[in-house]
Every structure is written in C-alpha cells, then in structure tokens.
Regions:
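Core subunits and conserved enzymes of cellular information-processing
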Residues: 1-191
C-alpha cells in the first residue's frame, strides 16, 4: 500500500513538472486525457487538471458499471495527478529550454510518472481507462490502443497548436510511450 501511495505522489509530481515545466511553455501536447486537458487550456484557458477530471467522469461512470477494479485502481491517480498538474501551473514561466529539448524532457518526465504509477497497478485513468475497457471486450492490445488514442488526441489539437508544434508533440508522445514502457518492465526482464 505504501508503495502505491508513493508511486501516485511521485508519479503525479513528475507529471506536474513535465507538463508545466516543458510542454505548456511551448504549447506542446501529450496524448490521452492530459492532451485533451492541454488543448482546452490552450484554446479556452481552462485549468488542465480540473478539465481532466470533468472529462473523465463519463469514463469513470462506465468503469463503475462495467469493471469496478479499473475504477478503484485509477481514481486516486486521476485526482492526485490532476491536482499536481494544476498546482505546478506557475512553473511554466521558470524553465526556458528550446522546444526540441522541452518535447523530449517533458515526454520523458510524463512517461516516467505514468510508468511509475502503472508499475504499482494504478494510473491516471482517462484514456488509459478507456483502453482497458476496450481491451476487456475486444481483446485488442492495450499499449496499441493507448498509442492510437494518444495519436488521435494530438491530431485533434493540430488546429490549435499548428503544424510545427504538432510535429514536436509527436516526439513528446513517442518519448512518453518509450519511458512508460521502460518503467513498467520488470527488473528481471532487463537482466
């Protein structure tokens, strides 16, 4: 239990820093619910974390009905990570790296945060939760589903962020995916 709590706290800290310190200053996107929250933030000025919570409500209702295990394993991750993303919003002014470095570092931090939570069988919910629910009924690969959803989210933000930032956002979601995969690999698999 302590490991899961620490994973949620540290993972959420990494998400908050990755999103606000590296993605937001350049108007870059991540995939999933974070990406949708960022699109709403860039377009309407809405708080990213709070937007993530509101947009996740239908998925959590569905999870409650179809598979309560997914509901309970991800609700705390969604709430804490959304809080940290909004608490760390002021740091977007502090770090001023180039867009290429920010896309990579932001993606690595976000991926590490998500991967750490997944390693301890929790998550931020959102589209990860959607992918798990789709997998339950259609036996499609969860990783592939998440990657496809992330790509669609970034593609949907193309008009808001423009082509150049879209390309850098593709680099970001690639880094997120790679780092997430590395974090969830069991230690004995690496050795």
């Amino acid at each position: 239990m302590t490991g899961k709590v620490l994973a949620v706290l540290i993972g959420s800290l990494l998400l908050g820093v990755g999103v606000n310190g590296f993605l937001v200053p350049h108007h870059l996107l991540d995939g999933g619910m974070i990406g949708i929250g960022l699109i709403m933030h860039y377009f309407y000025g809405w708080p990213t974390g709070l937007t993530m919570i509101f947009l996740s409500i239908p998925l959590y209702v569905l999870a409650w009905i179809l598979e309560r295990k997914y509901f309970f394993h991800s609700l705390h991750g969604l709430l804490v990570s959304s809080l940290f993303i909004d608490l760390f919003a002021p740091i977007e002014q502090g770090l001023q790296l180039g867009i290429f470095s920010s896309a990579i570092i932001g993606g690595l931090l976000v991926g590490c945060g998500i991967g750490l939570m997944l390693r301890y069988e929790t998550s931020t919910g959102g589209t990860d939760l959607l992918a798990q629910l789709i997998h339950k009924f259609f036996s499609l690969n969860v990783g592939l589903l998440i990657f496809m959803i992330d790509g669609l989210v970034v593609l949907s933000g193309l008009k808001v962020i423009g082509l150049e930032k879209f390309m850098y956002s593709l680099l970001t979601i690639t880094c997120v995916g790679l780092m997430t995969a590395l974090c969830v690999i069991k230690r004995e698999t690496i050795l």
